[in-house]
Amino acid sequence: MLKVGVVGCGAIASLITKALMSDRLNKAEVLAFYDGNLEKAEKLAMETGADFCRSLDELVSKDLDLIVECASVTAVEDTVIKSLNNGKDVIIMSVGAFADKDLFLKLYKLAEKLERKIYIPSGAVAGIDAVKSGSLGKISDVTLTTTKPVHGLKNALEEQGLNTDEIKEPKTVFEGTVFEAISKFPQNINVSVVLSLASRYPAKVKIIADPCAVVNRHEIFVKGSIGTIKTCVENNPCRDNPKTSALAAYSVIRLIKDLSEPIRIGT
């Protein structure tokens, strides 16, 4: 059985944990939690019967195979370094942290040196397998257009001085590079970094706030020597965290299951 620890105990962590608990094959189990908000970690531990850790050091010192980061971009560096140094592989949900090229290279080299793995799930978009394969050729264009309900972008927009109550129709609130996008929308546009890493090409990003939208819509366009890849996914937002698509959480669950099963489908 794959023994899992979780960093960050919000809605996504709860969804992942409960899905693994309900898996009849029982090939992976969450055994311990840590969150900077200790009350959240203790609450989720009590709900699931897992251990509650008072520090990240305590979590990574436990007998675990895998650490799943569900916290924030600011938690990624510390989580990965301590997990790898304690012999654990890591799944990163807050992949926006890897828009920092220096951090990505630093953690890549550490994982390589220690012969451990850092896993980045496909998240809330479709076609990542095809994009990865296509990146072996020449990529000439990568574009992501994301449309979300206004309330899902509310915090990021208001931090930029926009009054979301004044958005009465679909409004383009951002156009620019993946690096600019993740700095302005760190909890909303992780998929742009996944796409850029998979394609090995910096994505152009457009974000639309739509007051009538009820789903998170991600449209991908990739052009290269292999031809053209176009995908469109309309995701239901996570019920308890509308900034994130439910599919993003399910992609982590699927990855954990793949790591514990003898046959893996897809690139």
UniProtKB/Swiss-Prot annotation:
Top-level taxon in the UniProt lineage: Archaea
Enzymatic class: oxidoreductase
Pathway(s) per entry: Cofactor biosynthesis; NAD(+) biosynthesis; iminoaspartate from L-aspartate (dehydrogenase route): step 1/1
GO biological process: NAD biosynthetic process
Keyword list, A-Z: NAD, NADP, Oxidoreductase, Pyridine nucleotide biosynthesis
Record flagged with keyword Hydrolase: no
GO molecular function: aspartate dehydrogenase activity; NAD binding; NADP binding; oxidoreductase activity, acting on the CH-NH2 group of donors, NAD or NADP as acceptor
Catalytic machinery residues: 218
Protein name listed in UniProt: L-aspartate dehydrogenase
Upper lineage: Archaea, Methanobacteriati, Methanobacteriota, Methanomada group, Methanococci
